[in-house]
Protein backbone atom coordinates (compact mmCIF):
# COMPACT_ATOMS: atom_id res chain seq x y z
CA UNK A 1 0.00 0.00 0.00
CA UNK A 2 1.20 3.46 -0.90
CA UNK A 3 0.27 6.41 1.29
CA UNK A 4 0.21 9.65 -0.68
CA UNK A 5 0.22 12.69 1.59
CA UNK A 6 -1.07 15.87 -0.04
CA UNK A 7 -2.40 13.84 -2.92
CA UNK A 8 -5.35 16.11 -3.76
CA UNK A 9 -3.16 18.90 -5.14
CA UNK A 10 -2.10 19.18 -8.78
CA UNK A 11 1.10 17.11 -8.69
CA UNK A 12 -0.18 14.58 -6.16
CA UNK A 13 -3.38 13.99 -8.13
CA UNK A 14 -1.42 13.39 -11.31
CA UNK A 15 0.84 10.93 -9.50
CA UNK A 16 -2.19 9.04 -8.13
CA UNK A 17 -3.82 8.81 -11.56
CA UNK A 18 -0.58 7.67 -13.21
CA UNK A 19 0.00 5.03 -10.53
CA UNK A 20 -3.56 3.73 -10.73
CA UNK A 21 -3.30 3.48 -14.53
CA UNK A 22 -0.10 1.46 -14.29
CA UNK A 23 -0.67 -2.02 -15.60
CA UNK A 24 2.48 -3.46 -14.04
CA UNK A 25 1.28 -3.45 -10.45
CA UNK A 26 -2.05 -2.87 -8.83
CA UNK A 27 -1.41 -1.60 -5.36
CA UNK A 28 -3.79 0.18 -3.03
CA UNK A 29 -3.27 3.93 -2.83
CA UNK A 30 -4.49 5.86 0.19
CA UNK A 31 -4.49 9.63 -0.17
CA UNK A 32 -4.43 11.84 2.91
CA UNK A 33 -5.00 15.54 2.28
CA UNK A 34 -6.19 18.43 4.43
CA UNK A 35 -8.04 19.96 1.45
CA UNK A 36 -6.77 23.50 1.88
CA UNK A 37 -6.84 25.99 -1.01
CA UNK A 38 -4.90 23.78 -3.44
CA UNK A 39 -6.39 20.39 -2.58
CA UNK A 40 -9.53 19.47 -4.46
CA UNK A 41 -11.55 16.35 -3.75
CA UNK A 42 -13.30 16.80 -7.12
CA UNK A 43 -10.02 15.73 -8.72
CA UNK A 44 -10.92 12.17 -7.69
CA UNK A 45 -14.51 12.01 -9.00
CA UNK A 46 -13.59 9.60 -11.77
CA UNK A 47 -11.80 7.16 -9.42
CA UNK A 48 -13.84 7.43 -6.23
CA UNK A 49 -15.19 3.90 -6.78
CA UNK A 50 -11.83 2.39 -7.73
CA UNK A 51 -11.16 -0.50 -5.34
CA UNK A 52 -7.48 0.48 -5.19
CA UNK A 53 -8.20 4.07 -4.09
CA UNK A 54 -9.09 5.49 -0.66
CA UNK A 55 -9.28 9.13 0.41
CA UNK A 56 -8.82 10.26 4.03
CA UNK A 57 -9.06 13.88 5.08
CA UNK A 58 -6.17 14.56 7.44
CA UNK A 59 -3.45 17.04 8.24
CA UNK A 60 0.29 16.47 8.78
CA UNK A 61 0.30 19.22 11.40
CA UNK A 62 -1.99 17.00 13.53
CA UNK A 63 0.05 14.18 14.99
CA UNK A 64 -3.01 12.03 15.72
CA UNK A 65 -3.95 12.08 12.01
CA UNK A 66 -0.52 10.70 11.12
CA UNK A 67 -0.55 8.09 13.90
CA UNK A 68 -4.02 6.87 12.97
CA UNK A 69 -3.34 6.47 9.27
CA UNK A 70 -0.04 4.65 9.84
CA UNK A 71 -1.66 2.23 12.30
CA UNK A 72 -4.67 1.56 10.12
CA UNK A 73 -3.00 1.14 6.72
CA UNK A 74 0.62 0.10 7.45
CA UNK A 75 2.03 1.52 4.20
CA UNK A 76 4.95 0.10 2.25
CA UNK A 77 5.73 3.53 0.84
CA UNK A 78 4.92 7.09 1.87
CA UNK A 79 5.19 9.89 -0.65
CA UNK A 80 4.77 13.39 0.75
CA UNK A 81 3.44 16.01 -1.67
CA UNK A 82 1.90 18.10 1.14
CA UNK A 83 3.09 21.69 1.14
CA UNK A 84 1.95 25.24 1.29
CA UNK A 85 3.04 26.74 -2.01
CA UNK A 86 3.33 30.02 -3.91
CA UNK A 87 6.25 32.36 -3.41
CA UNK A 88 4.15 35.53 -3.00
CA UNK A 89 1.98 33.98 -0.26
CA UNK A 90 5.10 32.82 1.58
CA UNK A 91 6.40 36.38 1.73
CA UNK A 92 3.16 37.95 2.96
CA UNK A 93 2.09 35.06 5.25
CA UNK A 94 5.09 32.88 6.17
CA UNK A 95 3.50 31.44 9.34
CA UNK A 96 1.41 28.81 7.53
CA UNK A 97 4.46 27.77 5.49
CA UNK A 98 6.45 27.20 8.68
CA UNK A 99 3.55 25.29 10.23
CA UNK A 100 2.96 22.94 7.29
CA UNK A 101 6.25 22.73 5.41
CA UNK A 102 8.52 22.54 8.45
CA UNK A 103 6.57 21.46 11.53
CA UNK A 104 4.14 19.27 9.57
CA UNK A 105 6.93 17.48 7.72
CA UNK A 106 8.82 17.08 11.00
CA UNK A 107 5.70 15.46 12.53
CA UNK A 108 5.41 13.17 9.53
CA UNK A 109 9.07 12.14 9.66
CA UNK A 110 8.94 11.57 13.42
CA UNK A 111 5.93 9.26 13.16
CA UNK A 112 7.34 7.51 10.09
CA UNK A 113 10.53 6.78 12.04
CA UNK A 114 8.46 5.35 14.91
CA UNK A 115 6.49 3.25 12.39
CA UNK A 116 9.69 2.10 10.67
CA UNK A 117 11.16 0.97 14.00
CA UNK A 118 8.18 -1.38 14.49
CA UNK A 119 8.78 -3.14 11.16
CA UNK A 120 10.58 -6.48 10.97
CA UNK A 121 13.99 -6.57 9.27
CA UNK A 122 12.60 -8.87 6.57
CA UNK A 123 10.44 -11.92 6.22
CA UNK A 124 11.72 -15.42 6.88
CA UNK A 125 8.98 -16.80 4.67
CA UNK A 126 9.80 -17.78 1.11
CA UNK A 127 6.57 -16.28 -0.23
CA UNK A 128 5.71 -13.07 1.56
CA UNK A 129 2.12 -11.89 1.79
CA UNK A 130 1.26 -9.23 -0.79
CA UNK A 131 0.95 -6.50 1.86
CA UNK A 132 4.11 -7.45 3.80
CA UNK A 133 6.20 -4.45 4.88
CA UNK A 134 9.70 -4.67 6.33
CA UNK A 135 12.53 -2.29 7.06
CA UNK A 136 14.08 -3.49 3.82
CA UNK A 137 11.02 -2.69 1.69
CA UNK A 138 9.75 0.51 3.35
CA UNK A 139 10.33 3.81 1.53
CA UNK A 140 9.71 7.47 2.38
CA UNK A 141 9.87 9.99 -0.47
CA UNK A 142 9.73 13.74 0.09
CA UNK A 143 8.63 15.77 -2.93
CA UNK A 144 10.15 19.23 -3.25
CA UNK A 145 10.29 22.13 -5.71
CA UNK A 146 12.84 23.51 -8.13
CA UNK A 147 12.54 26.77 -6.17
CA UNK A 148 15.07 25.34 -3.67
CA UNK A 149 17.81 26.01 -6.23
CA UNK A 150 17.00 29.73 -6.46
CA UNK A 151 16.68 31.82 -9.58
CA UNK A 152 18.10 30.92 -12.96
CA UNK A 153 18.76 33.36 -15.78
CA UNK A 154 18.13 32.37 -19.39
CA UNK A 155 21.89 32.33 -20.06
CA UNK A 156 22.63 29.80 -17.30
CA UNK A 157 22.52 26.03 -17.82
CA UNK A 158 19.61 24.09 -16.34
CA UNK A 159 19.69 23.00 -12.72
CA UNK A 160 20.69 19.47 -11.86
CA UNK A 161 20.17 17.56 -8.63
CA UNK A 162 23.79 18.34 -7.77
CA UNK A 163 23.27 22.11 -7.72
CA UNK A 164 23.58 23.71 -4.27
CA UNK A 165 20.41 24.95 -2.65
CA UNK A 166 19.90 28.71 -2.86
CA UNK A 167 16.35 29.35 -1.69
CA UNK A 168 15.21 32.96 -1.98
CA UNK A 169 11.76 32.92 -0.38
CA UNK A 170 10.13 31.41 2.71
CA UNK A 171 8.42 28.90 0.39
CA UNK A 172 11.64 27.63 -1.16
CA UNK A 173 13.45 27.65 2.19
CA UNK A 174 10.70 25.61 3.82
At which residue positions do the language-model features occur?
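N-terminal Rossmann-like NAD(P)+-binding domain of SDR-like oxidoreductases, especially those catalyzing
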Residues: 1-174
